[in-house]
Amino acid sequence: MSVSAQGRGNGTGNMRHEALDELSFTEMISSVPLDEKTAALIRKFQDKEARERVLKSYGLSRNGCNVETFRNKEVLLITIPASKLFYPNSTELRPDAANLLNPVTRYLKEPDMYRVLIVMHTDNTGSEAYRERITEERSTAVFDWFEGKGLDTEYLFSYAYADEMPLKENNSMSNRDTNRRLEIYLVPGQKMVDQAKKGRMVF
């Protein structure tokens, strides 16, 4: 079961886009179509963004986080262990969670340059209702953190997938810890696509 950020405001007077809020996670990943020329420019831009900014904040050696590309290298994916954001069985963010969320705030400052997807996962421990609840409430907590910073969350979308998308088999403590995670997808927005088509991207 997944849940999106449907119907949330952002405290800044901006209206959400109902059509976007209704998209599934899979649909949102491809919500801005790209021709090959535009896609090539965006891949180049995202590669630079990953190397010069994202990897410096979320390198493999930092808190178990990981950075990779997604969807033909057009989307950046940041993975943060849930244990670095939440205490066990808790849906309240840890006091130091801001250290790992702060680097994402820059991607919400220019509306629709990026569509930022926050996707919460857990392992197969507990009942189905528990797994759904904890991922829904944790994804909401992350969304609300960004909203509470006074950021424009018009293009921020949250999803909860319980234990539906494990990275590894849930057959050891280590594997279950890997499956409990927050994924943040930095998806090119319409503004980025328009800039690429007009030759206005800065590398």
Predicted regions and their residues:
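Terminal low-complexity, intrinsically disordered regions
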Residues: 5-28, 161-165, 171, 189, ...
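Short, aliphatic-rich beta-strand segments
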Residues: 76-81
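N-terminal targeting leaders that direct proteins to extracytoplasmic destinations
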Residues: 1-75
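Short, histidine-centered active-site or binding-site loop motifs used for metal coordination
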Residues: 82-84, 120-124
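Extracytoplasmic/secreted proteins, especially bacterial periplasmic and envelope-associated proteins
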Residues: 24, 92, 96-103, 133, ...
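Periplasmic peptidoglycan-binding/anchoring modules of Gram-negative envelope and division proteins
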Residues: 55-71, 86-119, 184, 191-198, ...
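Periplasmic OmpA-like peptidoglycan-binding domain that tethers envelope proteins to the cell wall
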Residues: 122-200
